[in-house]
């Protein structure tokens, strides 16, 4: 919920509870659970009427009890930076990693982004290797289902890893890191060009295109496919593969010339990643505190990770400062409701 949004303002007392004795009694009766040891605040003065209509779900089933990702997310959400740091430093969970960079040119960053962590958490080499190794024979016509199957596998492999940034500008922002990853992939010969369009380029839709049926936030990958007809029939040309999101695993292919509102997406902002999840997610923080750095942003970045999470820190202390800060939400609706009640 964004800062100033209505839902966040209406539910701002949900964490503390503030149930009246009557509400508490009703909850205990219908649930069979005692609230005595819940730690929830009690509204004995009738000053929180809206809280009687709000319930907060407190148990996440997304991460298991022993999940380092789940525990780290809880410490961040509770604004406990010391506990979060202790978990990161202990290295006792095989799903949470931390990389402290020595300086801006530290090549450990490139190694992580390309290779990941050993056998499990992947980097960008994974999807590009699959792209090359699983490509159908070049004499297969475009109608052959092997092309669609291959494109689907590449798209799924790309979801194995995503780099998230807090900011857009600077060496630790989306723009600088997209260029840095592109340079590293070119040097490793995992891509064959750094021009605007090349095979393997992942792109993010930045605006809805109803004519193409593509929405803001959709991710596609440029692939070489055989031309179907005309003087260049059979020749490999670039098309961008997008998942159809139809529940059937379908893939649509779009010519790059038809895509006007796209950007390279080796790195994306945490804001753009909301609603998505990736097997291995890496969150890189800037080297100085920034107004957007809050516990909400850190929490969102952590919870985009399905199986593994890596925190990348160019400078010590920024993570702790961010966790101590929270978004101030104020839509004005609560003030109006309070005046109406009074």
Describe each region flagged by the PLM.
Residues 78, 218-342:
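C-terminal accessory regions
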Residues 206-219, 223:
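Flexible, glycine/threonine-enriched loop-and-boundary segments that flank and lead into catalytic domains
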Residues 44, 60, 187-190, 207, ...:
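A general structural-boundary detector
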Residues 163, 204-205, 283, 311:
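Short hydrophobic-aromatic micro-motifs
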Residues 2, 175, 214-215, 293, ...:
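Short glycine-/acidic-enriched loop or helix-start segments at secondary-structure transitions
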Residues 1-203, 209-212:
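Conserved helicase motor core of P-loop NTPases
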